[in-house]
């Protein structure tokens, strides 16, 4: 019963950012995937990690249009990135969509994601709407909270990939996709989770999935906790 209640609450939250309308047959993209990044996982497998941005929450990696065959849209023609398009909600962008790479500023990261994926959605979502939608999409649910309710915590424990996916599916009524990378010890570390909605963003749908990520039957993926680093400004542990 609680799961049904949670799904209902999430659907209401989803409707807040839905652009609605009828599905457009002339529009090549059938769904959108919000790619969420786990900062501690990213930083464990990337040397050029900006430790200032480590948070115990998932941050936005990107918003990707997919066609009906499950192929993401890449590098379409369209307008150039304009930072003024996010000026009204710039502070929220820095918090929710930060770059975790030391050599990439937040604005550079947004520009890259717009060029790589965002422009492909421009017939439906103009630049400002694209970024607003990603922010609202992220706020429609709490991945960490949903996982915690199913006994999955970012505490460096090992979990089967299917267990993580089933935990999220229980609450969103749709299958997510997870991504993981090997660290220097050849352990699989969770770095990203995709959550998908239909073209009009009125309901969650199953994400395109790579069967290989489901069928690491003898493998486990580790969900790192927030790592501790010395803050050079205060020499204290953060």
UniProtKB/Swiss-Prot annotation:
Coiled coil: none annotated. The keyword Transmembrane helix does not apply. The keyword Iron-sulfur does not apply. InterPro entries: Ribonuclease_T2_eukaryotic (IPR033697), RNase_T2-like (IPR001568), RNase_T2-like_sf (IPR036430), RNase_T2_His_AS_1 (IPR018188), RNase_T2_His_AS_2 (IPR033130). Disulfide bonds join 43-49, 76-120, 196-207. Belongs to the RNase T2 family. May act as a storage protein providing a nitrogen source. Seems to have no RNase activity although it has conserved the active site residues. This is Ribonuclease-like storage protein. It comes from Panax ginseng (Korean ginseng).
């Amino acid at each position: 019963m609680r799961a049904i209640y949670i799904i209902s609450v999430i659907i209401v939250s989803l409707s807040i950012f839905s652009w609605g309308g009828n599905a457009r047959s002339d529009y090549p993209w059938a769904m959108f995937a919000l790619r969420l990044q786990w900062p501690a996982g990213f930083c464990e497998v990337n040397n050029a990690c900006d430790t200032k941005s480590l948070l115990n929450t998932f941050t936005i990696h990107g918003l990707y249009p997919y066609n009906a065959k499950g192929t993401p849209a890449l590098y379409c023609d369209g307008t150039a990135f304009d930072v003024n398009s996010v000026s009204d909600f710039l502070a929220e962008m820095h918090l929710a969509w930060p770059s975790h790479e030391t050599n990439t500023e937040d604005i550079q990261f947004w520009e890259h994601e717009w060029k790589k994926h965002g422009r492909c959605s421009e017939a439906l979502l103009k630049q400002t709407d694209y970024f607003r939608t990603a922010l609202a999409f992220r706020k429609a649910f709490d991945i960490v909270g949903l996982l915690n309710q199913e006994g999955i915590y970012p505490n460096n424990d090992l979990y089967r990939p299917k267990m993580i996916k089933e935990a999220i599916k229980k609450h969103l009524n749709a299958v997510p996709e997870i991504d993981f990378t090997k660290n220097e010890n050849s352990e699989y570390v969770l770095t990203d989770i995709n959550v998908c909605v239909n073209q009009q963003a009125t309901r969650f749908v199953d994400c395109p999935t790579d069967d290989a990520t489901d069928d690491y039957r003898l493998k486990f993926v580790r969900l790192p906790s927030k790592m501790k680093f010395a803050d050079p400004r205060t020499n204290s542990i953060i």
